Amino acid sequence: VVEERVEPWRFDTARNRSLELVPEDADICVCTDLDEVFHPGWRAALEAAWTDGTTQAVYRYTWNFNADGSEGTVFWIEKIHARRGYRWTHPVHEVLERQEGWGPGRKCTAEGVQLDHHADPAKSRGQYLPLLELAVEEDPNNDRNVHYLGREYFFYRRWEESIAMLKRHLALPTATWADERCASMRLLAKDYFA
């Protein structure tokens, strides 16, 4: 076990430092958080889907659960990747990016791989707002982070800032994902009625 302190804290820096600690002979990196659990059989399902030339796996992720224990928000995630050719980017809500010089990546869909997130509702998420502000400062045209910052301002009841950021999100030419655009519009409506 290696213990390190990442200061100032950024999720991408911490994940990239962790990647540096992965043994050189590793082929595949599986990134999970301490509050996430794979369903039994995930490794066999991953190995069946991963073929020569694969560099990243797409698999099912349950982000939260309803009060009755049924699945809440579910989507596909891509945090399993080849040992080389990837780096994490963004201070928060970090994502994998293919590095230059490694050629195009090739994804596989890993049917049967299921990761469940069991968030601790008592855990503070207070660090997210300043990290999202930093993310948008670093990359002002990243539609995903602009949306997340508008949403975070909404959570903090900072209505005017939320409205400005969500409108900015909707105006970005890269903001084409219908689900996220819809979320921005719903939050805008709530901002106006707050």
Predicted feature residues:
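Short loop->beta transition adjacent to catalytic acidic/histidine clusters or analogous donor-positioning motifs
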Residues: 1-2, 26-27, 158
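Short, acidic/glycine-rich phosphate-metal binding loop used to engage nucleotide
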Residues: 3-11
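Active-site nucleotide-sugar/metal-binding loop of Leloir-type enzymes
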Residues: 13-28
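Catalytic-site signature of metal-activated, phosphate-bearing donor transferases
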Residues: 16-19, 38-164
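The conserved acidic donor/metal-binding loop of glycosyltransferases
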Residues: 26-38
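Flexible helix-coil transition and linker loops at the boundaries of alpha-helical arrays
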Residues: 136-139, 170-185, 194
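TPR/TPR-like alpha-solenoid signature
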Residues: 147, 186, 190-193
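Specific register positions within alpha-helical solenoid repeats of the TPR/Sel1-like families, i.e.
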Residues: 154, 193-194
